[in-house]
Every structure is written in structure tokens, then in C-alpha cells.
Amino acid sequence: MEPTLEGQRVCPSLEGASNWYSTSFNPATGLYYVQTNDKCGVFTKIPAEWEAGKGFMGGSFVQAPGEPAQRVLRAIDLQTGKIVWEVPQTGPVTSWGGVLSTAGGIVIFGDDSGAMAAADAASGKPLWSFQMNQNWKASPMTYEFDNKQFIAVAAGSAIITFGLPD
């Protein structure tokens, strides 16, 4: 599909689908967890010629006007390819944070509102949310130190770490 002078609508867009964000698989549930951006865009061709030594894009991209975007955490059954559950999020669809699933049956993710959130790995039921007011560009990770488990994420200009209860 080629861009046109009038603009070509494309779904998912350049910033849509599952792009940068880490995914996670939980062998206990058989589910694959992925953050997705349901977002369409318009690609426009610019009638300009390439010249050596000058920047050239050949066109432009904008979010499809009048079409609100939506960030959604999805759990997919790898045996069937069917979506088992979804957690729609509220926000500007600018977060690029991925997901972390744990042996304890939770999925931790960066909600598009800027919060760190957790959902039940089997049902998708929201469990908790902590507003960090940060735009996520990384995925949560877990580690152990001195026999204590931690969850950390780089969000905004900070690295935020939570100690989990024993």
C-alpha cells in the first residue's frame, strides 16, 4: 500500500499494534500477554525530489483524525490464537511499557494512565494500581536481593522499585 498525496489510512499505524513493548508467556495459564495500541494513521506522500546531502522523508504520518486510539492489555491463548481477556486502558496511548507475568499468577504492566498495575493472570481481573504519573518506555522486571523479591521499572526519568511482601 503506497502513501498518496491525499493520504492513505493504515491500521494499525506506525505506532499501533504491538511494537516495542516486551511480551510475556505464563506456562501455568498457557496465555501470552501483550500490550497493544489500537491506533490508525494516515500516511501522506510529499511531491518532493530527493537531493544528495539534504534530509528527505518523502512523506508524513499523523494519527487518523477523529479516530480515538486505545491501549489494551491482551491475554492470548497460544493453542487457539483467541483473545481470552482484555484490560482496556485510559490514556493518551503514548506508553510503550510491556508486561511481566509471574509464577504467583499476576501480570504487571504499565497502564497508559501512567500507573503500575497488576491483573490476575488467568482472568484479567484488575488487582491493584499505583499511580506513578510517568510515561512508560520500558517493561517491568523482577529480581531478588537478600531473599526479598522486588519489581522495578524505568519510567519517565526515574527508576522505580517496589519490594514485595513476604
Question: What kind of region is each of these model predictions?
Answer:
Residues 1-9, 39-94, 100-103, 107-166:
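Extracytoplasmic/lumenal domain signature
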